[in-house]
């Protein structure tokens, strides 16, 4: 079975060169998660957006469907969380990457304009708000020489998250190719600070590939985190079109495999965007490749184009097709699959099933 996703990528009618990702979490959890940001770097020392190039612009034949239209973010929880994050000078991928779920997540699952009954979900990036890569799908700003990391950020982030009284948190970061270890030690310090302030908290880290440095992967994987997440983003054939040249399909698989091997009971997770021109068979193969290295959790969502300078949307995948991918993912062995048009990497990251999955894995590995 193959959908119109099989249409080959072509230079669009309009000239020009995608941000994405986080979603609602249940009561007692917060997703502090990440949008992967990676592409050819701009001029040294300047902060900018992804460069224009082929495969960009708007495709007049592809119209945004009604199921993707959302109200502008509002609501008391949204306003309070935005104020709190601003006062704490924390960077959120919700804002930086123009996430479509910001209203729903920050209102605790109640939709863009109303409040839900869960804990508001925010997406916090450590290591600053400027990425050293510039993938064509991502709206996060880029620079070859971003400001140095704030040495107080690990403690300040831990203090902020601990004050929110949550029991599950997702941390993420921009890529930092300018740092010797890609920022792994800074990331690990944040995890350890969180665990010290609140020993029972479950921590998910959505990481870069650290340029394939497996020692950096080990450092973070052994920092005390509970879920190691790293996104392959798209199918093998589209990697060089979608991601920065320094990223790669096999490199990402190697990172996930090494993280899995670092500690017994480690939960690993990845994410795939749809609507970029991939075929059904390519999506199936990507799922099989992820399962072959033991990845436990998979999220699939629609790629949304932030500006005309980002990758063109080739298809808006229907909710019914996303349901098909959820069922297919479960059939090949993923322990949890979140699949839908607005699903992002941290979608329902801390929901009860995932929390139980992590805790059961801990119990099983400690008793074996």
UniProtKB/Swiss-Prot annotation:
Q: Which cofactor does it need?
A: [4Fe-4S] cluster
CDD domains membership = Radical_SAM
Q: What is its EC number?
A: 2.8.1.8
> Gene3D superfamilies this protein is in?
Aldolase class I
* GO process annotations (BP): lipoate biosynthetic process
Q: Which residues take part in binding [4Fe-4S] cluster 2?
A: 131, 135, 138
Instruction: Write out the GO cellular component annotations.
Output: chloroplast; mitochondrion
Describe which pathway this protein belongs to, using the record's wording: Protein modification; protein lipoylation via endogenous pathway; protein N(6)-(lipoyl)lysine from octanoyl-[acyl-carrier-protein]: step 2/2
The protein's location, in the record's own words, is: Plastid, Chloroplast
UniProt catalytic activity? [[Fe-S] cluster scaffold protein carrying a second [4Fe-4S](2+) cluster] + N(6)-octanoyl-L-lysyl-[protein] + 2 oxidized [2Fe-2S]-[ferredoxin] + 2 S-adenosyl-L-methionine + 4 H(+) = [[Fe-S] cluster scaffold protein] + N(6)-[(R)-dihydrolipoyl]-L-lysyl-[protein] + 4 Fe(3+) + 2 hydrogen sulfide + 2 5'-deoxyadenosine + 2 L-methionine + 2 reduced [2Fe-2S]-[ferredoxin]
Specify where it is mainly localized.
plastid
> What sequence ranges are listed for the domain Radical SAM core?
114-335
Write out the ranges of the annotated region (Disordered): 1-30, 42-61
- Write out the similarity annotation: Belongs to the radical SAM superfamily. Lipoyl synthase family.
Q: What is this protein called?
A: Lipoyl synthase, chloroplastic
- Recorded source organism is Sorghum bicolor (Sorghum)
């Amino acid at each position: 079975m193959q959908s119109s996703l099989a249409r080959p990528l072509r230079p669009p009618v309009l000239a020009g060169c995608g941000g994405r990702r986080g979603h609602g979490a249940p009561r007692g959890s917060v997703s502090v998660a990440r949008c992967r940001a990676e592409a050819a770097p701009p001029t040294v020392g300047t902060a900018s957006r992804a460069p224009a190039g082929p495969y960009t612009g708007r495709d007049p034949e592809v119209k945004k469907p009604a199921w993707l239209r959302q109200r502008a973010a509002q609501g008391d929880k949204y306003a309070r969380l935005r104020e709190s994050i601003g006062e704490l000078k924390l960077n959120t991928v919700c804002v930086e990457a123009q996430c479509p779920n910001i209203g729903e997540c920050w209102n605790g699952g109640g939709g863009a304009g109303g409040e839900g009954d869960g804990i508001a979900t925010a997406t916090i990036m450590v290591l600053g708000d400027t990425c050293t890569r510039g993938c064509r799908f991502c709206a996060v700003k880029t620079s070859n020489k971003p400001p140095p990391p704030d040495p107080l950020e690990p403690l300040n982030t831990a203090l902020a998250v601990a004050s929110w009284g949550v029991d599950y948190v997702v941390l993420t970061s921009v890529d930092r190719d300018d740092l010797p270890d890609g920022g792994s030690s800074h990331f690990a310090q944040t995890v350890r600070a969180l665990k010290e302030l609140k020993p029972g908290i479950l921590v998910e880290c959505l990481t870069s590939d650290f340029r394939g440095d497996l020692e950096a992967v080990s450092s973070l994987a052994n920092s005390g985190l509970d879920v190691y997440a790293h996104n392959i983003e798209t199918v093998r054939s589209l990697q060089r079109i979608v991601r920065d040249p320094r990223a790669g399909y096999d490199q990402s698989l190697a990172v996930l495999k090494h993280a899995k091997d670092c500690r017994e009971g480690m939960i690993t997770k990845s994410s795939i965007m749809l609507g970029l021109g991939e075929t059904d068979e390519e999506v199936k193969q990507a799922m099989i490749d992820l399962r072959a290295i033991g990845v436990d959790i998979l999220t699939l969502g629609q790629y949304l184009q932030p500006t005309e300078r980002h990758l063109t949307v080739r298809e808006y995948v229907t909710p019914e097709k996303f349901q098909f991918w959820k069922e297919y993912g479960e059939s090949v062995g993923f322990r949890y699959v979140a699949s839908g048009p607005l699903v992002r990497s941290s979608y329902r990251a801390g929901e009860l099933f995932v929390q139980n999955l992590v805790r059961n894995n801990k119990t099983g590995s400690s008793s074996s």
